[in-house]
Structures are given as C-alpha cells and as structure tokens.
C-alpha cells in the first residue's frame, strides 16, 4: 500500500479523532524512523514518550516473539510467570508495594481514582468523597480521567462528569490548601505537567502537598505516565523530590509500544482499598504484556538508563538554550531530564510540520510549546543533529 492509498483509506475508515501529519512510517531503527518512501527522520518524540529504547531493539523483539510463540493470554483467573516477574521489578524500581496492570494510561488513572475512593469509604464508612486535581493537567480521555483533567476544552462536550472534583493551581500550594475539607480523600497531579506545557513541580510545592496529605490523611496520587520510566533521570520523577506517593500511575515507556499501564500503591492503601470484585481487566497483565514490561525494566536497570539520561540532559538543555537565545520568538525552555519544552510565540504546529520536511520528528505540548521527548538512548551526535535540523526550520520561520 503506498502513502496516498494508506492516507485515503484511513480517512475513509478510521474515526477522525486526530489531525494527523501526512506521513506514513514504515519501520524504525535506533532513534530513526523511515517512511514508506524511504525518507529518514530523527525521532525526538518517541511515540509521545513511549519508545524509550527506540526502534528495532533485538532483545526486546526476541522476548516478545518468544512469548507470542509460548503463551499470550489466559485471563486473570490464573497466575502467570511473566507478569509476576514484571511486578517484582516495577515494585523494586518504584519502592511501592502493590501493582495492578491495565491496558493504558487512562485506565491506570481510573484504577487509581477508584482505589482512593474505596480507601476513604473503608476508613470512614461512607461514600461521597472529593478529589483535588490541577488546572492545566492531563490525565486521559476516559470519563474518570477526564474528570480530573483541568482543561475545559476537553471536558465540556462530555459533561456532566464525575462530581466532587475541585481544581487547584499547579505549583501554588495555597491554592491546594484552600480546597481541602473533610470530604477530601485524594490529591492527584502530574509530577511534570506534560500536555499543559512541560511544567515540573517545584520542590516547595510537591513537598508541601505531601505534608498536607499527611496532615489530613489524604492520599497523594502522582501521575507518572509520561514523566516516569527513567525519562527525567530517575526511574520515576517523584524520586527527585524526596517524597513518596500513596498511589502512582505508569504507562507509555512501561511497555515501550505494547499497550500497558499500571497503578501502584503502598501496603497501607492496598489493605483498605480494592478487594476481589472491586476492579478487574480481561487483558491487563497477561503473559505477553508481562514479557514486555519485564524485559523493559530488566534492560533499564542493566543498562543504567537513568545514569545515561542524567549525563545527556545538560547537553540537550545547552543546545535548546542556544536556540532560545538565537531566536526572539523562542522565549523560554523548561523541563526535567529528557522531557523538555521550548516556549514559542509562533505557531508550534507549523514548526512541527516544517520539521518533518527536514527529517525531524518533534511534537507540541499545548498551544505554544515545542515538546522534546526523545528515546532515552540518544547520544550527543543525535542532539547535535536535532539542533542543526531545528535551527534550519526556525530560520525559515
């Protein structure tokens, strides 16, 4: 199928929920993608922070092929070895106590919200609890996750959403404090806001929220779906801050392309929250997914991925800062590790489109931010190539 046929038939058959770029990728290798015409692209999007090890990683591919040939699915009515091994690895990496595997990030958020509500129900003997979320946040598009996503543009067509959600301002502790009442059972936030424009939490804010939660017996839910799995130089971004959540969510690079998410919790929460019959999934945590997650976590630990991210991050920041200094319409850079954003006064969608013409894949975050979330295996030579290509694009603006 050629490019034009693929695009035409996709437009005729797939629901129009995305404004896609006119590119059909055929295969990938390392940090590069190749379209159906054979054109090469340096990938600084990684499938929206998914492909931590890039493309065509032989160890990962072989692990999945082996598991496909052996056993893919049996249901959660039975035990399976791959997901048990994966569970032990993710709990070790996160220093949490219990995990539930889902099919996606938004499902992980749904499970986290249910766990928080059930915890409060068990503790207090009644329902009707509230949750505090953040403005400009993004947690997913299913109804529960959408209810805690602080963006009216996403929410309005689907109202009424889940009641009892109150929104505070990210990185403004007093805003959170003002919303706490006797009904508050949880506070949910992204450790680094992604779709909202790449805003890391400040130390004062995240540590302050943790203290408020401890004071009022409120559960802290940290969304690590985009910023977790080594992207910031720690396995999970909250590990930079000297705090620990009661519940956290993960997805994206957790499976490196295999659809999988997870919500994790401390033993204290697990003892009072979800019990048999409270939650479930048909596909979640099957042997195939287990092989993917187990392999990803094994490779990350063995290859010291977080150390590599810490080493390469200053070089990426230096190159992006140089571009901000050069172009007046670039006004700031912010981010943590290999999750960076550059604020732009010109249309970022047009810049991302123009970058494709130059063989560079970058994406946007909100209306005015160029987002850089490359595979975690990039080297200095890839950062140099990105900066050179992006410089050429910006010259044309």
Annotate each language-model stretch with its function.
Residues 1-397:
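Conserved N-terminal phosphate-binding loop of PLP-dependent enzymes in the Aspartate aminotransferase
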């Amino acid at each position: 199928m050629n490019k034009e046929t693929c695009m035409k038939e996709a437009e005729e058959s797939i629901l129009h929920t995305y404004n896609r770029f006119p590119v059909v990728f055929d295969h990938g290798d390392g940090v590069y993608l190749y379209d159906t015409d054979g054109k090469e692209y340096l990938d600084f999007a990684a499938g929206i922070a998914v492909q931590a090890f890039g493309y065509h990683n032989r160890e990962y591919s072989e692990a999945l092929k082996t598991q496909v040939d052996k056993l893919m699915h049996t249901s959660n009515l039975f035990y399976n070895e791959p997901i048990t091994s994966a569970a032990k690895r993710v709990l070790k990496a996160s220093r949490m106590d219990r995990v539930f595997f889902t099919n996606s990030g938004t499902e992980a958020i749904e499970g986290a919200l249910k766990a928080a509500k059930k915890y409060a129900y068990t503790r207090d003997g009644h329902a009707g609890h509230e949750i505090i979320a953040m403005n400009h946040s993004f947690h997913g598009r299913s109804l529960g996750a959408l209810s805690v996503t602080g963006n009216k543009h996403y929410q309005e067509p689907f109202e009424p959403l889940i009641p009892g959600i109150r929104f505070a301002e990210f990185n403004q502790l007093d805003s959170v404090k003002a919303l706490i009442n006797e009904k508050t059972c949880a506070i949910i936030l992204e450790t680094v806001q992604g779709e909202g424009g790449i805003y890391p939490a400040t130390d004062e804010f995240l540590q302050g929220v943790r203290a408020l939660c401890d004071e009022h017996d409120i559960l802290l839910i940290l969304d690590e779906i985009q910023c977790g799995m080594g992207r910031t130089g720690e396995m999970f971004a909250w590990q930079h801050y000297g705090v620990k959540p009661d519940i956290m969510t993960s997805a994206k690079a957790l499976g490196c392309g295999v659809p999988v998410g997870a919500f994790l919790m401390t033993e204290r929460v697990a003892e009072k929250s979800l019990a048999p019959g409270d939650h479930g999934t048909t596909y979640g945590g099957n042997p195939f997914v287990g092989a993917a997650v187990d392999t990803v976590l094994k490779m990350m630990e063995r290859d010291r991925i977080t150390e590599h991210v810490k080493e390469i991050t200053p070089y990426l920041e230096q190159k992006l800062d140089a571009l901000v200094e050069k172009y007046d319409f670039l006004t700031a850079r912010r981010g943590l590790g290999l999750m960076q954003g550059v604020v732009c006064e010109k249309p970022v969608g047009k810049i991302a489109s123009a970058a494709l013409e130059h063989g560079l894949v970058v994406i946007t975050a909100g209306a005015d931010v160029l987002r850089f979330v490359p595979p975690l295996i990039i080297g200095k030579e890839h950062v140099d190539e990105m900066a050179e290509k992006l410089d050429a694009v910006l010259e044309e603006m």
